[in-house]
């Protein structure tokens, strides 16, 4: 059964958000989705790069207003 996760990282600053995202995704199955909420400006750069290098798919990012929202899918 697929589960979708919401990860609230508001108030955390680099490098904590990426470390928590990586640990969370490691415990997920392929094709599961995770919604990430963050107010750290560094995530606008870090999360797309993380997805690229770790081969996950960034389905959506909303970064015009805080909290920023990112929807990721594990795997490609």
UniProtKB/Swiss-Prot annotation:
GO cellular component, one term: cytoplasm
Compartment list: Cytoplasm
Keywords linked to the UniProt accession: Cytoplasm, tRNA processing
One Pfam family hit: TusA
GO biological process, one term: tRNA wobble position uridine thiolation
Gene Ontology molecular function, alphabetical: sulfur carrier activity
Active site positions, chain numbering: 14
UniProt cross-references to InterPro entries, sorted A to Z: Sulphur_carrier_TusA, TusA-like, TusA-like_sf
Metabolic or biological pathway, per its Swiss-Prot or TrEMBL entry: tRNA modification
Keyword hit for tRNA processing: yes
Family according to the record: Belongs to the sulfur carrier protein TusA family.
Function: Sulfur carrier protein involved in sulfur trafficking in the cell. Part of a sulfur-relay system required for 2-thiolation during synthesis of 2-thiouridine of the modified wobble base 5-methylaminomethyl-2-thiouridine (mnm(5)s(2)U) in tRNA. Interacts with IscS and stimulates its cysteine desulfurase activity. Accepts an activated sulfur from IscS, which is then transferred to TusD, and thus determines the direction of sulfur flow from IscS to 2-thiouridine formation. Also appears to be involved in sulfur transfer for the biosynthesis of molybdopterin.
PANTHER family: SULFUR CARRIER PROTEIN TUSA, SULFUR CARRIER PROTEIN YEDF-RELATED
NCBIfam families to which the protein is assigned, alphabetical: PRK00299.1
Assembly notes: Interacts with IscS.
UniProt protein name: Sulfur carrier protein TusA
């Amino acid at each position: 059964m697929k589960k979708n996760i919401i990860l609230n990282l508001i108030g955390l600053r680099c490098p904590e958000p990426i470390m928590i995202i990586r640990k969370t995704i490691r415990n997920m199955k392929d094709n599961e989705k995770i919604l990430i909420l963050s107010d750290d400006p560094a995530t606008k750069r870090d999360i797309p790069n993380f997805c690229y290098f770790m081969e996950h798919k960034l389905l959506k990012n909303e970064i015009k207003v805080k909290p920023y929202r990112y929807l990721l899918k594990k795997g490609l």
